[in-house]
Amino acid sequence: SVNQTAEEIVESFLLSQDNSLEKRKLKKIFEPQNVSDEYDFWISHTAKECKRNQFICFFIDQPTGYKENVSAELKKRFWMTPPYEDYTLSLDNLIQISSLYNNWLREYTINNNLNFCSLSEKLEPNTDNFFDDAHFSENGSKKVAKILSECVKFSIDLSII
């Protein structure tokens, strides 16, 4: 409806998509051992462009609700498991995949002397921080901004020394 608030629109969307871990009857297993070639390509390409142009770039991992200690309320809002499919992956698969990508990015930045900020371990997986699997609530966005500003400040302070 035209008079819906942004919060009501989001809630309406979540209710139509949510609880995919329980609602989708078809369960598939996907346990990649490496990040996708496309992800590797684009991260590498971005890093090369940063160095070539002498940009100060920051690489940031992706916080998600995919944690063992995810709140029951947030877990019911999961829909990106994957999105728009008739099947779901298990929470264990989702944890493994998100950890694989976040750990790969951390290692890549260390090995290539790039700035890295870790968010994934700093946001509790609950509805105070997330609307759903990976989208921040307003409060979560504020926490992300604070964490990132501290990370950038720390990195800049180190480069001055």
Q: What are the residue ranges of the model-derived segments?
A:
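Structured segments of extracytoplasmic/periplasmic soluble domains
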Residues: T46-E49, Y108-N111, K122, I147-S159
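Histidine-centered active-site loop/cap adjacent to the catalytic His
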Residues: Y39, N115, F130-I161
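Serine-dependent acyl-ester chemistry module
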Residues: S1-R106, E124-T127
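Active-site-adjacent bridging/hinge elements
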Residues: N115-T127
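Conserved beta-strand segments of alpha/beta enzyme cores
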Residues: I56, N113-N115
